[in-house]
């Protein structure tokens, strides 16, 4: 029972982290002006301008929906087939979210530092607020990845562990006096 509660709490935590990561990124935008001589030129930053950030929003949304469904399934049904499916899906979605976070981290790094070999300048000096919120979203997303990895480890131990994790404690045999 304690393991089921821990699993549900971890899945709820993954839901909250993924929703927060998606919302922070999806709402992230900034408008600014730079001066070219005496002419102000408007600049705009939106998450939708960068495909990696869009991927991050969708991946976080998929993880949140999956974890919600997994909570319902784990509360309603208990079978080895379901445990195997959750083990597989926890890993698959951890990899999906890790891929989205890694791609977005690379874009954020280039935005912050630029890429000298390609003569790409950094842009975060013009969009500091935008870049800071990208960082917040990435932290939330990587935390969600860690929760999913923890769930995959717990699922694997439950399926393949000897003795199985969360197995009911065995009671010693009662000796009757002769």
Swiss-Prot record:
The UniProt entry lists membrane topology as: Multi-pass membrane protein
**Which sequence ranges are listed under topological domain Extracellular?**
26-52, 102-132
Question: What InterPro entries is this protein classified in?
Answer: CASP/CASPL, CASP_dom, CASPL
Q: Which UniProt keywords apply?
A: Cell membrane, Membrane, Transmembrane, Transmembrane helix
Give the location in the cell. Answer: Cell membrane
Cytoplasmic compartment ranges equal 1-4, 74-80, 154-178
Q: Could you state one GO cellular component term attached to this entry?
A: plasma membrane
Enumerate the transmembrane spans.
Answer: 5-25, 53-73, 81-101, 133-153
Task: Give the family this protein belongs to, as stated in its UniProt record.
Answer: Belongs to the Casparian strip membrane proteins (CASP) family.
What protein am I looking at?
Answer: CASP-like protein 2U3
């Amino acid at each position: 029972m304690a393991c089921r509660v821990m699993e549900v709490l971890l899945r709820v935590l993954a839901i909250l982290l993924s929703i927060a990561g998606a919302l922070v990124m999806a709402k992230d935008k900034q408008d600014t002006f730079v001066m070219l001589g005496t002419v102000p030129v408007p600049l705009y930053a939106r998450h939708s301008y960068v495909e990696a950030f869009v991927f991050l929003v969708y991946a976080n949304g998929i993880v949140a929906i999956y974890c919600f469904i997994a909570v319902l399934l784990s509360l309603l049904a208990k079978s080895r087939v379901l445990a195997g499916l959750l083990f597989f899906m926890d890993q698959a979605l951890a990899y999906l979210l890790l891929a989205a976070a890694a791609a977005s981290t690379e874009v954020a790094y280039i935005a912050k530092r630029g890429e000298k070999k390609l003569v790409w300048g950094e842009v975060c000096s013009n969009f500091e607020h935008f870049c800071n919120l990208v960082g917040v979203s990435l932290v939330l997303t990587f935390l969600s990845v860690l929760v999913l990895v923890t769930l995959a480890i717990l699922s694997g131990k439950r399926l393949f562990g000897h003795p199985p994790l969360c197995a009911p404690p065995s009671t010693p045999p009662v000796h009757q006096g002769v």
